[in-house]
Curated annotation (Swiss-Prot):
Main location per the UniProt record: secreted
S-S bonds: C24-C44, C37-C65, C50-C54, C69-C80, C81-C86
Annotated protein name in UniProt: Alpha-bungarotoxin
Remarks, miscellaneous: Is identical to Alpha-bungarotoxin (A31) from B.candidus (AC Q7T3J2).
InterPro entries in the cross-refs: Snake_3FTx (IPR003571), Snake_toxin-like_sf (IPR045860), Snake_toxin_con_site (IPR018354), Toxin_cobra-type (IPR054131)
Length: 95
C-alpha cells in the first residue's frame, strides 16, 4: 500500500511539472491580450522595428509565444523572457 501511494505521489509531481505553461502578451489578437502559450512554447518574445510610418506612429511591435527566441534581423530589436506576462507592449504598464 505504501509503495502504491509513493508511486502516485511521484507520478503526480512529474505530471504537474511537465504541464507548466507560460502566459504571454500577444499581438495576434486585437486588442493585445494575455494568452496561455501552447505546450512546448515556454518563452515570451517582443520584436520591434521601424517601418515607413515609424516617424509618425512609432515602432511596429510584435508580441507572442515561442519555443526558441526568434532570430534577430539587423533592423529589429528582439527580447525574450520566461516568466508570465514578461513581454508587455512598451506603451502598456506591466501586469
Amino acid at each position: 500500500m505504501k509503495t502504491l501511494l509513493l508511486t502516485l505521489v511521484v507520478v503526480t509531481i512529474v505530471c504537474l511539472d511537465l504541464g507548466y505553461t507560460i502566459v504571454c502578451h500577444t499581438t495576434a489578437t486585437s486588442p493585445i491580450s494575455a494568452v496561455t502559450c501552447p505546450p512546448g512554447e515556454n518563452l515570451c518574445y517582443r520584436k520591434m522595428w521601424c517601418d515607413a510610418f515609424c516617424s509618425s506612429r512609432g515602432k511596429v511591435v510584435e508580441l507572442g509565444c515561442a519555443a526558441t527566441c526568434p532570430s534577430k534581423k539587423p533592423y529589429e530589436e528582439v527580447t525574450c523572457c520566461s516568466t508570465d506576462k514578461c513581454n508587455p507592449h512598451p506603451k502598456q504598464r506591466p501586469g
